[in-house]
Each structure stands twice: as structure tokens, then as C-alpha cells.
């Protein structure tokens, strides 16, 4: 998880809801796409930055296999606790989980074939510094794969949450939900990677659907996995009730055949050290 939201993800209820609702329906499909983009191969060494509950790391460990190596870092200990509690997937490499920031990375130089960061870089206070650290720890011609969401308006589940929040709670709290979408420019992301020294950089923009099969109530439960949820829990009960009533109204707009269906769109860059 990203540095700027560490304190929210250190509230245990948030990582638990994140892992239950968001990981399987959102982050695992995107992790598969990211691993495809970097063409991860058997036997390679991988660094996963802002691993959260280990989503990318676990799938990467299967791809590199027992002869590969995976180091996964995060700054939120409750997220790492969830990741460490999971059994390895069949045929995977061991995963070394470490509590660490992205600047500096806990690795010697030229140690990895691939560095990955799924939906973390936009939160880091020193984005260029984090990119330079990724390049430092990569072997010559090593590969980087980074995914960053586009505008919140093109990610309608969180747009629905934001609309409900803006209508019912203080603006400062409401706008925390926009943090994952704070670096929507693909060209800016690509330029930052070039400034950090990466080359042969390719930019992809992809969309994938997220389906909450149990509908609106499940989508409301999913909100508990966002870093805004602890702040909402501190509001007066009547304010919370008003918020969730408005949230149900907004989420109803996304219902198809009883399910909440929302596309998510992200920029992805792949480059070489």
C-alpha cells in the first residue's frame, strides 16, 4: 500500500475488507494484465512494490516458479500480515514479505529482473525518486511494469462513492476517495519514467469490468475497503445513515441484472532499465 495512505490501512478492518471485496474482483484481474504486459518468465527475480495483501506477488510467484524469487514490500503492517497468512499457490516461488518504503528500496543494486508496482506510485510523495529506486535495483535490461488509474470519472464505482460523499460529509474527507486517481495522465507517467532513466517505454491504457455479483449492498460493503472508511466511521450515526442512503442511490445507476457492474480504466507503462 502507498505511503500517503499508510495510517488508514493500518486500521485492521480496512485491509480485511479490501482483501475480501476488492482483491478478487478488481486487483487480481489487473495483476494478471500487468504480468502479461511485462512478459514475466519462469526463473526470474521479481520485486513487488506496494504489495498490499500480496496480490501481484502471489501471481508473479506462480509465473516465475520454484526457481524464481519474489520480494514484496509494503509500509502497512496489517496488509503484510494478511499476505503472510496465505498459503503459497501451487508451483510458486517463495515470497519474502518485508515492511519497507519505496524510497529507498531494501535491496542492493542490479538485483532483480522485474520491478512491479500496481496502483501505488501515484501515492508516493517522491514519485521520481521511487522510479529511480526501481531502476537502481533492476539488472541491466531489467523490466519495469507500473499501473496507475486514470481519472475518477472513468472509474464509476469510486465516482459513485465520491458523489455520495461530496453530498453528505465534509469536503476534505470526501475528496480522500479521489487519491487513487491523482495521476491520470499517461503521458506524464511515461515522461516521469524517462526522467528516472528508463528506456523503451511503452504506454498502454486498458479497461476491465468489476462485477459485484450481490448488487448494491455488496458495493456498500466494499466501501469498507477504502481508506476513507475509518474517517466515515467517526462521523455521527445520522450522518453515516444519510451517506449510505445516498450511496445506494448512486450505486443503483450501475446495476445490471441485479449486479453492480463498473469498468475500471488504468494506464500501464512497461520499460527497460
What residues fall within each predicted segment?
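Conserved class I S-adenosyl-L-methionine
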Residues: 1-44, 55-59, 79-82, 86-90, ...
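A short SAM/SAH-binding and catalytic strip from SAM-dependent methyltransferases
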Residues: 113-127, 150
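Class I SAM-dependent methyltransferase SAM/SAH-binding core
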Residues: 45-105, 129
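Conserved hydrophobic residues forming the short capping helix/wall of the S-adenosyl-L-methionine
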Residues: 64, 87, 165, 193, ...
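Conserved Class I S-adenosyl-L-methionine
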Residues: 3-8, 15, 27, 53-55, ...
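Conserved catalytic/acceptor-binding region of the Class I
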Residues: 128-129, 135-213
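A short acidic, Gly/Pro-enriched loop at the edge of an enzyme's catalytic core
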Residues: 103-114
